[in-house]
């Protein structure tokens, strides 16, 4: 009788949600999609000075092993189909961080005929990291914001 009361209140599913989201935030495996100068700052964030390993972040070489894509730099019209193809190869759940002014909205090259004005026109973006180029600290802050977003999602019972 007591367990049925807990089940009706959603206690068990809420606790399971917390455990699943905790595990997801502690094991983000990003796939780097470096397109321009922002990729240098993304590589800097992976260095020993910032130590992304303490957040459980391990860069993966293939999209089939990753659950986070970091788009860093200017996305051109010619590269957009490749970005979408790589995104489609990632397993669910998957997240995208758009890093830099060019990836967010075209940046300096906004009025160029060959530039996509924001990678959110190609793939759904979860976190935007502003800057030209954004610092490694800004990317680290964006990753922390993504972890907070993952913790607040409802994984088991979607409403």
UniProtKB/Swiss-Prot annotation:
**GO-annotated cellular components:** plasma membrane; respiratory chain complex I
Which residues of the sequence carry a binding annotation for [4Fe-4S] cluster? Answer: 37-38, 102, 132
Cellular location of this protein? Answer: Cell inner membrane
The Gene Ontology terms for molecular function here are:
4 iron, 4 sulfur cluster binding; iron ion binding; NADH dehydrogenase (ubiquinone) activity; NADH:ubiquinone reductase (non-electrogenic) activity; quinone binding
Q: Extract the InterPro entries matched here.
A: NADH_UbQ_OxRdtase-like_20kDa, NADH_UQ_OxRdtase_20Kd_su
Q: What detail does the entry give on cofactor binding?
A: Binds 1 [4Fe-4S] cluster.
Q: What is this protein called?
A: NADH-quinone oxidoreductase subunit B
Catalysed reaction, written as an equation: a quinone + NADH + 5 H(+)(in) = a quinol + NAD(+) + 4 H(+)(out)
Task: Provide the taxonomic classification.
Answer: Bacteria, Pseudomonadati, Pseudomonadota, Gammaproteobacteria, Candidatus Pseudothioglobaceae
How is this protein positioned relative to the membrane? Peripheral membrane protein
Function in brief: NDH-1 shuttles electrons from NADH, via FMN and iron-sulfur (Fe-S) centers, to quinones in the respiratory chain. Couples the redox reaction to proton translocation (for every two electrons transferred, four hydrogen ions are translocated across the cytoplasmic membrane), and thus conserves the redox energy in a proton gradient.
> What Pfam families does the record tag this protein with?
Oxidored_q6
Q: Which organism is it from?
A: Ruthia magnifica subsp. Calyptogena magnifica
For this UniProt record, the keywords arranged alphabetically read as follows: 4Fe-4S, Cell inner membrane, Cell membrane, Iron, Iron-sulfur, Membrane, Metal-binding, NAD, Quinone, Translocase, Transport, Ubiquinone
User: Which cofactors are reported in the record for this sequence?
Assistant: [4Fe-4S] cluster
PANTHER family from the UniProt entry: NADH DEHYDROGENASE, NADH DEHYDROGENASE [UBIQUINONE] IRON-SULFUR PROTEIN 7, MITOCHONDRIAL
Enzyme Commission code: 7.1.1.-
| A GO biological-process term | electron transport coupled proton transport
- Similarity comment: family membership: Belongs to the complex I 20 kDa subunit family.
Q: How does it assemble?
A: NDH-1 is composed of 14 different subunits. Subunits NuoB, C, D, E, F, and G constitute the peripheral sector of the complex.
This protein's gene is called: nuoB
The protein's matches in SUPFAM superfamilies, at most eight in alphabetical order, are given as: HydA/Nqo6-like (SSF56770)
């Amino acid at each position: 009788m007591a367990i049925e009361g807990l089940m009706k209140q959603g206690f068990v599913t809420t606790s399971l949600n917390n455990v699943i989201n905790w595990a997801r935030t502690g094991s983000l495996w990003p796939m780097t999609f470096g397109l321009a100068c922002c990729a240098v700052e993304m590589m800097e964030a992976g260095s020993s000075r910032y130590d992304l390993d303490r957040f459980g972040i391990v860069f993966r070489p293939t999209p089939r092993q990753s659950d986070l894509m970091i788009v860093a730099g200017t996305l051109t019209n010619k590269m957009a189909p490749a970005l979408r193809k790589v995104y489609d190869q990632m397993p669910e759940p998957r997240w995208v961080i758009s890093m830099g002014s060019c990836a967010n909205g075209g940046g300096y090259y906004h009025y160029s005929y060959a530039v996509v004005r924001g990678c959110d026109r190609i793939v759904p973006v979860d976190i935007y990291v502003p800057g030209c180029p954004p610092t490694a600290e800004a990317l680290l802050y964006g990753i922390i914001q993504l972890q907070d977003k993952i913790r607040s999602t409802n994984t088991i019972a979607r409403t």
